[in-house]
Amino acid sequence: IAALAGAWDMFGTQLTAAMTIEKLDDHLWSMEYKGDYGFDGFLEQGGAKSDAEMGDYIASFLSHGFWKPDTSAAGGNYGCSTVAVTSPDGAALFGRNFDWEECDKMLVHTVPKNGYESIATCNLDFLGFGEDWKPDGSMGDKFMALASVYAILDGMNEKGLCVADLMVSHEEGVDQNTDKPDITIVSGLRLLL
């Protein structure tokens, strides 16, 4: 019983989040993550200079160092756009397109211990778990899908702040050397939300 209690203490938040994954439509899932998803720890350890470094942190945090999934970088040509408008009744509306022919998407609802509640989207293909991977198979597949909390492409928080990564294929990168934690585009979006 002590071992089970220890395992729950270590993985309870992640297991609870994994159990919320629901298929909404072809290529569309949703999940809710309540609690600490490790973002403060990510910043405290210096952030990450690359998607690969960020992936290493995510795998280590979610698995507590017990395993690391095989991943490969997603690529391709793309260009995204967003729209923000006010409806006739005064409501603020925010939307985006996913400029991929076909991709698996996750609606990610987060309620962090230290931050604002938000809803965001993730292109699951960008997690790099392979073309045949889906988040609704085994518990292991669902657990891997928790990485979508970090790989968001847009979102809105409870205060109304909307952010988006408008992707355009390019080769040049930006490298700034400061005393602040390193962040990638997607970790910057998570930080803002």
Features from the language model and the residues they span:
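N-terminal mature-domain region immediately after signal-peptide cleavage
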Residues: 3-193
